[in-house]
Amino acid sequence: MDIRNIIKRPIVTEKAVLMKEKSNKYTFVVDKSANKFQIKYAVETLFNVKVKSVHTSNCVGKSLKVGRYAAGYRSDWKKAIVKLGKGQEIQLADKV
């Protein structure tokens, strides 16, 4: 798997920004088939940082109401929380 396809996008929410500021953890949406070793290698290669640990979570898509009677679902996705070593930083556009 290509490392550019492993990390899809960063998650920039209030909780993610607080985790970044307090404990140097960054949150990403990643490919569902990627494992922790692939995620660690992709982050270290793309952002030129040293990763301390990776935690992953499979998030189940929510059910939606589409139209009057039909039901639909959002896609399932995978979230990775990456903790960087001391003094490491990733420049993200999280200041709005």
Swiss-Prot record:
It holds the Pfam family Ribosomal_L23. SUPFAM superfamilies: Ribosomal proteins S24e, L23 and L15e. One of its GO terms (biological process) is translation. The keyword rRNA-binding applies. One of its GO terms (molecular function) is rRNA binding. InterPro entries: Nucleotide-bd_a/b_plait_sf, Ribosomal_uL23-like, Ribosomal_uL23/eL15/eS24_sf. It comes from the Bacteria. Keywords: Ribonucleoprotein, Ribosomal protein, RNA-binding, rRNA-binding. The keyword Ribosomal protein applies. Belongs to the universal ribosomal protein uL23 family. Part of the 50S ribosomal subunit. Contacts protein L29, and trigger factor when it is bound to the ribosome. NCBIfam families: PRK05738.1-3, PRK05738.2-4. HAMAP family: Ribosomal_uL23_B. PANTHER family: 60S RIBOSOMAL PROTEIN L23A. This is Large ribosomal subunit protein uL23. The gene is rplW.
